[in-house]
UniProtKB/Swiss-Prot annotation:
Cofactor: binding comment: Binds 1 Mg(2+) ion per subunit.
Subunit structure: The RNAP catalytic core consists of 2 alpha, 1 beta, 1 beta' and 1 omega subunit. When a sigma factor is associated with the core the holoenzyme is formed, which can initiate transcription.
EC number: 2.7.7.6
GO process terms (BP): DNA-templated transcription
Record: residues binding Mg(2+): 543, 545, 547
A molecular function (GO) term: DNA-directed RNA polymerase activity
Name of the protein: DNA-directed RNA polymerase subunit beta'
Family recorded in the similarity comment: Belongs to the RNA polymerase beta' chain family.
UniProt function note: DNA-dependent RNA polymerase catalyzes the transcription of DNA into RNA using the four ribonucleoside triphosphates as substrates.
Cofactor(s) for this UniProt protein: Mg(2+); Zn(2+)
Residues annotated to bind Zn(2+): 1017, 1092, 1099, 1102
Length: 1412
């Protein structure tokens, strides 16, 4: 939208904004925005509290305080009179008082007409001074042939009137062009200039005499004490020089304005490009010239500023302010406090200072005061305006309050967490929301949450009021509101009625990933706490120790449908991070299921036969058979589906029969904890538990091995298989087509119609889905039939109304999609029930001591005594003794752990052991502390970067371990020793959480605009994947199976016999992946995000499977944000401690953890420890020689690599290695570019310089995966690929060819390819550039959207560069659309697929006549 056409910004509809541009405001622009000049520093009258006329809150300028009230005469008008002029009095007509809403005070601006030009603070202080870069002032000092560049500081001194500049030499040799005249050398420079000028005039002339007098006075002043201390009078001497010659010397903003007026931008550009070409040649000749590299970078930056002004066509003089805008009054409010005190925004004080100084300058000028006084006043005015623009960045003279607090300027209102971008534009406060403490709601269904009645009454107040009035319970809104406030019992039935089909959204801070916000169906509870389903706590990372949650209410019908379809907890079963269920039972539920599935040999009732399941339950209730006894039931009682093919009886425990009874009839029977791939292993597994007729049950059972009960891991595997079996396969549209064909006469045969449907894989529906769908359909139709019959007889062939069909569709669709959750709810109920029945309790007597503990402790003490003896004799150093002692105590603790493990192995009745083995709570490490020894404790010594670089031993572990266990009790020393570690754990966690949150924020900014936008980009450029192997330990980090599952193949896959296993362009499912791996294939070429051709986005085939839905990703999915959340969310689990156990803090120890992750993602050039040396060539290691032979002081090695040059000649390259670095190669080894020669982290820039982008991508992927996998966290490759793609998305231009790029500019890789493609097609010279790697901190700052970049970091720098280049934001990303109030271009606002897993269309739309 062209903002030049309309200045009525307040009336622009946010939906009509298509793009936003920034430019330098001209003085005319400011006058056009303004509704009057502010010329008085007063705000409000201290008696009347009314705004002062012409002051900072003037109602005529900024709008009325009361709606539609004349600011002059006080007469009130109606809304219909808005924008009219008041003509009630003569004064009203003279002043042009306009009738406005008080909202005008939020957008009406004023201005201050400055009495001196003022340079905008941002343009000489931000990013090493834009003014300095643009002018590029140089001066030839003396006889020097090389010019000296005038520094940023010198220009700042000039702006603040501390020094003067020679603007015109007037032919005087003593004055060099652009020479900055500093106070220390002013006397000599002026003296030489005057001596040179005097020669122009004959002796005895008036001019000669005047100049001679001036020279004499100057000599007296410079030799006097005052002259030496305070310098000379610049202004008088400048006037003399200007009067008697054509030279000109000036200072302040006027001098800068003169220089900006004279600059020839195109000539400057040509000069810079020529200089750049010369520097570039020197660098190519000698790549080690660091100073030349720095010079080149400075020239790049200068060229960028010059180009910005040329391309935008703006006048650089517009960086000088003549009319200062005054922001609307309500954006810098003055608030009345108790009594007659007022609190005001800091901006008002800053504006006040400007107005006072501006008025004073005006008076001095009118009084023709001496130049020095006027210049001083101009300097003070410059400082006052600077303080208003950016008070924080002022190095000196910050404007402060009485208490010494710097005042908040306009820049502070924009930047930081509390600034306009992040506080008000990206994050807003929400109406219809509340918060309360959460408690467990074990009786809730998965899609439900308990909402306190009081909260519901307030949140749904408008709907309740409407209901009360409609049902004539009250006569007015006021009465209804009073009734709700008083909690009148009449309202509760209406509250219950109103909340039907109105979902609520729950959010728990910190919102680390999308599962921290989920939706539920509200269930009213009488308490004051929100009740939460126990299975969804994992997604929220919530517990019930006082956590609070926020509640939000979606209001519009579209928002409600979106919430129900996309955000309901029963739709968020899988975690997006790894595609595994996140709703697995834990704690009490696991303990209950563990207890339920236990088997006991010889238990009461073992071998009993029951004819029915109910008879077995009755016997259990009468206690004639135990829960853990193995009994026999007829096959058809348990699995009627399979009974048709298998006959006989089934053996299991009473508990396992109860457990299996909650699963659908066609789900495999669970006999033991071997639950991997139940469907595949079922036939072989079932044989030993099925007995033919006539078998002696008791005898057979006695010989049968007792099975292990189900632990947490086994239950998680069962949940996964339940999801795979019963997760929805159809689209809503498919079920609608069946409902459309049914009536009350044929609904019983709906299964025939369902059999014709095909799932999203184009396959027939499996039997479990057919049976469940027909069951739901028959039930809902019969219910509707009964309901209609209450109003009279219903014909069987009656055609259903559209709204009836829509209602049926909603109910069947909900039940169909809720199949998995209904089973999970049954598992949850069973777990809680049997954990209660188990009566599990613990006592101190349950803790059994480690049998051989004291033997191990004795062994350790003897070893330590030996070490001390060796140290005393000087055989080992103190550091070596410390390292060996730590290693020994670590081994002793491991031995005690193993001993304890053996002693509790068969103790299945011990409650503590049950909790540990089931995975409900605690692990062997906790048990060792209770019953073995506490072990080594952390010290408060921190490993520093310098320790890692110098391989120092860091004593971060207390050498003397805590030998006692909690059962024995700690000694006073041991207790004191363990306090360090306990506190360190808590502080680390707190720091970790903050750093992890910051990492997530940066990653979101990096990848926020990556959305799935197309079906296929038709890229034929693949990505070869294989097992990610840690070359140091030779262990697999990520297996090939995980890397190819859910991805599209780029090439056909054949086995060793040439048989095709999978075709190119197909998505690899789990079975195909297993087949490929089983065939022994080591490498597979897949489609990858790293090779997707879509600009700033990705296509479905390059992305593959959406892990959260377990099917192909939908168009509109914001995969960039999901990737950022998936990498950032587990960040808190990554330990920030280095992994060394008190030994040498070397590189190997610091390979994992949060620190290394940040190094990789931010592309650090100085990582922890000594960086690895890498091979720059393809070659062979021919020699590894010892450096000590040549120079004893420098110990180390020289590695000689023999390689072939481009001319195929043999050459040698020698690399120096320090002695402390561990070699990874030997003589005769072949090396490739980028290969590590020694241990240590690789610097990403170095790797990119010697190899290619693909090598760097593989290295980053491997390293990031290794960090997470070491902590047991699995993250999908595709998320890391998205971040890597963004890190390598920029190209630096080295030759611009015929393109519009300029040398040194950093451009997006897709723009670079697009421009080059066009140039090549037109037979023109393409541009050449190098791919550069940028860290996550810098990528958002290089965004094409200045709104997205400015809302991230360095706001003022981004805005300055956007302004000088008149940048246009096309609002393509997510952040910028949120800022302007648009819907984001993703999800349901993009080209959303109708036949996806979730459908947000109105159910009526499927049955509308015009839709058929």
């Amino acid at each position: 939208m062209n903002t030049k056409v309309s200045r009525q910004y307040a009336k622009i509809s946010e939906n009509s904004i298509q793009k936003i541009s920034l430019a330098l405001a001209t003085p005319e622009d400011v006058l056009e925005w303004s509704r009057g000049e502010v010329h008085r520093p007063e705000t409000i009258n201290y008696k009347t509290f009314k705004p002062e006329r012409g002051g900072l809150f003037d109602e005529l300028i900024f709008g009325p305080l009361v709606d539609y009230k004349c600011s002059v005469c006080g007469r009130k008008y109606r809304k219909s009179n808005e924008n009219q002029l008041c003509i009630a009095t003569k004064e009203c007509k003279i002043r042009g008082s306009r009738i406005l809403s008080k909202m005008a005070r939020r957008y009406s601006m004023g201005h201050i007409a400055l009495n001196a030009p003022i340079l905008h603070f941002w343009f000489f202080k931000i990013d090493h001074s834009i003014i300095a870069k643009l002018l590029g002032l140089k001066v030839f000092e003396g006889n020097s042939k090389v010019p000296t560049t005038i520094t940023k500081t010198a220009i700042e001194n000039l702006i603040y009137y501390k020094s003067h500049i020679v603007l015109e030499t007037g032919g005087l040799k003593s004055l060099e062009q652009n020479k900055i005249i500093d106070i220390s050398e002013a006397g000599l420079i002026y003296k030489n200039a005057l001596i040179e000028i005097i020669e122009f005039y004959p002796p005895g002339s008036e001019e000669h005499n005047a100049l001679a007098e001036s020279i004499s006075e100057l000599a007296d002043v410079t030799s006097s004490k005052i002259g030496r201390e305070y310098g000379v009078d610049y202004y008088e001497l400048n006037e003399i020089i200007e009067e008697f010659s054509s030279a000109r010397i000036a200072t302040g903003a006027l001098a800068i304005e003169y220089l900006l007026d004279k600059i020839d931008l195109r000539a400057e550009k040509a000069a810079v490009e020529a200089e750049l070409a010369g520097v570039q040649k020197q660098i190519y000749k000698n790549k080690k010239i660091i100073l030349k590299n720095q010079k080149r970078d400075k020239l790049y930056k200068r060229l960028q500023v010059i180009n910005a002004f040329i391309n935008s066509g703006q006048d650089p003089k517009m960086m000088i302010i003549r009319n200062l805008p005054v922001i609307p009054a309500d954006l810098r409010p003055l608030v009345q406090l108790d009594g007659s005190r007022h609190s005001t925004s800091d901006c008002n004080e800053l504006y006040r200072r400007i107005i006072i100084r501006n008025n004073r300058l005006k008076r001095w000028k009118a009084a023709h005061a001496p130049v020095i006084i006027i210049q001083n006043e101009m300097r003070m005015l410059q400082e006052a305006v600077d303080a208003l623009i950016d008070n924080q960045k002022k190095s000196t003279n910050q404007v402060t309050t009485k208490e010494g607090r710097p005042l908040k300027s306009i820049s502070d209102a924009l930047t930081g967490k509390k600034g306009r971008f992040r506080q008000n534009l990206l994050g807003k406060r929400v109406d219809y929301s509340g918060r309360s403490v959460i408690v467990v709601g074990p009786k809730l269904k998965m899609h439900q949450a308990g909402l306190p009645r009081k909260m519901a009454a307030v949140l749904f107040e408008p709907w309740i009021i409407r209901n009360l009035i409609q049902e004539k319970k009250v006569g007015s809104i006021k009465m209804a509101r009073k009734m709700i406030e008083e909690e009148n019992p009449i309202i509760w039935p209406h509250v219950a009625k109103v909340i039907q089909n109105k979902p609520i959204i729950l959010n728990r801070a910190p919102t680390l990933h999308r599962l921290s916000i989920q939706a539920f169906e509200p269930v009213l509870v009488r308490a004051k706490a929100i009740q939460l389903h126990p299975l969804v706590t994992a997604g929220f990372n919530a517990d019930f120790d006082g956590d609070q949650m926020a509640v939000h209410i979606p209001i519009s019908p579209e928002a409600i449908r979106e919430t129900q379809e996309l955000m309901f907890a029963d739709k968020n079963i899988l975690g997006p991070k790894d595609g595994e269920p996140i709703v697995n039972p834990s704690q009490d539920m696991v303990l209950g299921l563990y207890y339920l599935s236990q088997e006991k040999a010889g238990a009461k009732g073992e071998g009993s036969f029951f004819s029915t399941y109910e008879a077995m339950l009755k016997a259990y209730e009468f206690r004639s058979v135990e829960l853990h006894a193995r009994v026999v039931l007829p096959f058809e009682q348990v699995k009627p589906f399979i009974a048709k093919t298998m006959r006989g009886h089934l053996i299991s425990t009473v508990g396992k029969f109860i457990l299996n009874n909650i699963f659908p009839a066609n789900f495999p029977f669970i006999f033991d904890d071997n639950v991997d791939e139940l469907e595949l292993n079922y036939p072989s597994q079932i044989k030993k538990y099925v007995l033919p007729y006539g078998t002696n049950f008791r005898e057979y059972i006695q010989n049968l091995k007792v099975n292990e009960p189900l632990n947490k891991k086994a239950i998680a595997k069962i949940v996964r298989q339940i999801f795979d079996t019963y997760d929805g396969l159809l689209a809503k549209e498919d079920i609608a087509t069946v409902i459309d064909q049914l009536d009350f006469g044929n609904y019983q045969n709906c299964v025939l119609l369902y059999e014709k449907l095909r799932d999203y894989k184009k396959q027939k529906l499996p039997v479990p889905h057919l049976s469940k769908l027909s069951e739901f359909t028959i039930f809902e139709y019969s219910q509707l039939y009964k309901q209609l019959q209450q109003n009279g007889p219903v014909e069987s062939y009656r055609v259903l109304e559209d709204h009836e069909k829509a209602e049926l569709l909603e109910k069947i669709w909900f039940k169909y999609n809720n199949m998995v959750c209904s089973i999970l709810d049954k598992i949850k109920d069973l777990g809680f029930h049997y954990s209660t029945l188990s009566g599990t309790s613990i006592a101190i007597s349950d803790i059994k001591m480690a049998p051989k503990k004291h033997e191990f402790i004795k062994e350790g003490e003897n070893y330590i005594n030996k070490l001390n003896t060796f140290y005393a004799k000087g055989l080992i150093t103190d550091d070596e003794r410390y390292v060996l002692a730590i290693a020994k105590w670590t081994q002793i603790k491991n031995d005690i752990q193993e001993d304890l493990n053996q002693s509790i192995k068969d103790d299945n009745q011990n409650s503590l052991v049950m909790m540990m083995k089931s995975g409900a709570r605690g692990n062997i490490s906790n048990f060792v502390q209770l019953a073995g020894m506490r072990g080594l404790m952390a010290n408060n010594v921190k490993a520093l970067k310098v320790d890692a670089e110098n391989e120092r031993v860091v004593r971060s572990i207390v050498e003397v371990p805590v030998k006692s266990s909690f059962l024995e009790g700690l000694t006073s020393f041991e207790f004191y020793s363990s306090t360090h570690g306990a506190r360190k754990g808590l502080t680390d966690t707190a720091l970790n959480t903050a750093k992890s949150g910051y990492l997530t924020r940066r990653l979101v900014d990096v990848a926020q605009n990556i959305v799935v936008v197309a079906e296929d980009c038709f890229s034929d450029f693949g990505f070869v994947v294989k097992d990610i192997i840690d070359t140091k330990t030779n262990t697999i980090i990520v297996p090939l199976l995980e890397r190819i599952e859910g991805r599209f193949l780029n090439k056909d896959v054949y086995d060793s016999r040439g048989i095709k296993l999978a075709s190119a362009g197909t998505m690899v499912d789990l079975q195909t992946a297993k087949k490929i791996v089983a065939a022994g294939i080591k490498k597979v070429e897949i489609r990858s995000i790293l090779s997707c051709h879509i600009k700033n986005s990705v296509c479905k085939k390059c992305y593959g499977k959406d892990l959260a839905t377990n099917r192909l990703v939908s168009i509109g999915e914001a995969v960039g944000i999901i990737a950022a959340q998936s990498i950032g969310e587990p960040g808190t689990q990554l330990t920030m401690r280095t992994f060394h156990t008190g030994g040498v803090a070397n590189v190997e120890d610091i390979t994992g953890g949060f620190t290394r992750l940040i190094e990789l993602i931010d592309s650090h050039e100085h990582p922890w420890g000594k960086p690895a040396k890498i091979s720059p060539y393809y070659g062979i290691i021919t020699k590894i020689s010892d450096l000590a032979e040549k120079n004893a002081a420098n110990k180390g090695f020289l590695i000689t690599i023999e390689y072939k040059t481009s001319k195929n000649e043999k050459a040698e390259h020698i690399i120096r290695i320090e002695q402390s670095q561990k070699l990874r190669v030997k003589v005769g080894d072949k090396v490739i570019p980028g290969q590590k020669l020694v241990e240590g982290p690789i610097i990403l820039k170095e790797l990119l310089a010697v190899s290619d982008a693909r090598t760097l991508q593989n290295y980053l992927l491997k390293e990031i995966q290794r960090i997470y996998r070491m902590q047991g966290i699995s993250i999908s490759d595709k998320y890391i690929e998205i971040i890597i793609r963004q890190m390598l998305s920029k190209v630096q231009i080295i030759e611009n060819g015929d393109s519009n790029f300029f040398i040194g500019s950093i451009v997006d890789i897709s723009d670079y390819q697009e421009v080059n493609g066009q140039l090549i097609s037109q037979n023109k010279n393409p541009a050449f550039g190098n791919v550069i790697v940028k860290g996550a901190k810098q990528i958002p700052l290089l965004s094409n959207s200045f709104l997205a970049a400015a809302s991230y970091q360095e706001t003022s720098k981004i805005l300055v560069h956007s302004v000088i280049s008149s940048q246009i934001d096309k609002l393509e990303g997510l952040k910028e659309n949120i800022i302007v109030g648009h819907k984001i271009p993703a999800g349901t606002n993009s080209n959303y697929e109708p036949k996806s897993k979730f459908d947000i269309r109105n159910p009526l739309s499927f049955f509308m006549k015009n839709n058929r």
